[in-house]
Amino acid sequence: MVQTSRQTRSSGRRRKPTNNRLLLVVDQSSSSKRAVEYVATVLASRRGFQLCLAHFLSQLPPEMLEFGGAEDPEREQQLDRQLKTEQQQWIATARKGAQPSLNWACARLHKAGLPASSLTTQFSDPFRAQNSVSEEILELARTNKCRTIVVGRRSLSWLRRLTAGKDLAEQLVQQGSGFTLWIVE
């Protein structure tokens, strides 16, 4: 998609495009690192950009989604509390494992001249439905008012499994109408 300047009706002056919010998908893959490097190079020392760095956690294992129930209501509540505790521990461990790649990306972008105040980070929802990673990326972009999405061409193997063997980038191209996509080789 090529973005062009538009003229305002009242003044006849050109307005600058407002595509200054980017969603950058980050993981531990070399492709993701190349995407971060590309963004750092393109936006080096430029002001006015906001970047949301999103790390996609793998889905919770099926055995952590539900416990099967119990006839005794007290036992049911106990099992429910135990399951929620285990889920929270799993998510905390997954986030801890993902944090180094987010920290590296933030440090690299900051080194390129992007102020820390222009960077935000977030994690995906590990409770998401099967095969909805591209939809979740698009929803994150909408929620964060990002009109540009940046992804590496190849993602981690577990992410490829979630996208039914298709490249995440391919799915975004098919579903990402209205967004500018930067797919970094």
For the regions a protein language model found, what residue spans apply to each?
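Gly/Ser-rich helix-loop-strand patches that form or flank binding pockets
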Residues: M1-G12, E136-E185
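Short glycine/proline- and acidic residue-enriched helix-loop micro-motifs
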Residues: R81-T93, L119-F123
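Small/aliphatic-rich secondary-structure junction motif
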Residues: R13-E86
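A conditional alpha-helix N-cap/helix-loop micro-motif detector
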Residues: S32, Q130-N131, G165
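Redox- and metal-dependent alpha/beta enzyme cores, enriched for Fe-S-associated oxidoreductases
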Residues: Q59, E66, E86-H110
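Structural beta-alpha unit
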Residues: M1-G12, P17, K96, W104-T148
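A structural signal for isolated positions on well-ordered beta-strands in alpha/beta enzyme cores
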Residues: L23, Q50-C52, T120, T148, ...
